Amino acid sequence: MQIYQPHPWPLTVEEAITIQEELRHQVITQDQFTQPVQYVAGVDMGFEADGTISRAAVAVLSFPDLQVVETSLAYRPTSFPYIPGFLSFREIPAVLDALEKIQTKPDIILCDGQGIAHPRRLGIASHLGVLLNIPTIGVAKSLLIGRHEELADTKGSWQPLIHRGEIIGAVLRTRVGVKPVYVSSGHKISLPTAIDYVLRCTPKYRLPETTRVADKLASNR
C-alpha cells in the first residue's frame, strides 16, 4: 500500500497541538467511500524494551465474512511519550510502516482508539484517516471525553456521546452483558454508518474482529 509522506513528527506537546489544530479542519464526517465494502482493516500497537520500541500490527479482513486476507508487522523506535490525547503521535509512525507492507488496500480501517471523540477532534482514527485519505472509524475500549445516558443491555443499543453540546460519537453495546465500546467517526464516514460497520464486525465478541486479529499480532500472542 502506497503511503505518502506525512507531516513532520513533533517532538513537543506544543508542536503536536499545532498539528492537531491544523488537521482537524480536514476531517470529513460524512460518508465518502465506494460500496460495497470488500476489505476492512484493524490496526493495533504493542511496545518492547520498556516502551522504547513500537510494534505496529495491521490485519486486513474480507467483508462481510471477516476472513483474514493479509497481515503485517512493523517495528521502529518510539519517538513520542505516552500522553493521553496525543497517542497518534506515538503510534502512527509505526502504523504507517506496517500499512506500507500490505498489498490489499482496505476500504475502511477500524482503529483501537478515538476518532473525533477527542478534545481537539483528532484522535488516532481521524489523524490516520486524514493522512491516508481513507475512511476510518474509532472504536475505543474506554471513554476519553464526553457524557452519555444509560445504555440498554441489548446488542446494538447505543446512546450519543456528547461533549460541549456536540455529538462526537456513540457508546455502543456490541455484546449482551459486556462493557460497551466508544465509537466515533474517524474520517470520511458518518456516525450511523460507523456504528453499522462496527456491529457487522463484532459477530461474537465485544471488539471488532479486525481489532482482535491485529491485537494478537501486536501482542505477540
Swiss-Prot record:
GO MF terms held by the record: deoxyribonuclease V activity; magnesium ion binding; RNA endonuclease activity, producing 5'-phosphomonoesters; single-stranded RNA binding
EC id: 3.1.21.7
Record's catalysed reaction(s): Endonucleolytic cleavage at apurinic or apyrimidinic sites to products with a 5'-phosphate
Biological processes per GO annotation: DNA repair
Alphabetized UniProt keyword annotations: Cytoplasm, DNA damage, DNA repair, Endonuclease, Hydrolase, Magnesium, Metal-binding, Nuclease
Top EC class, one word: hydrolase
InterPro entries: Endonuclease-V
Subcellular location: Cytoplasm
Any Gene Ontology CC annotation: cytoplasm
Keyword Magnesium: yes
Main location, first listed in the record: cytoplasm
Name of protein: Endonuclease V
Organism phylogeny: Bacteria, Bacillati, Cyanobacteriota, Cyanophyceae, Nostocales
This protein's encoding gene: nfi
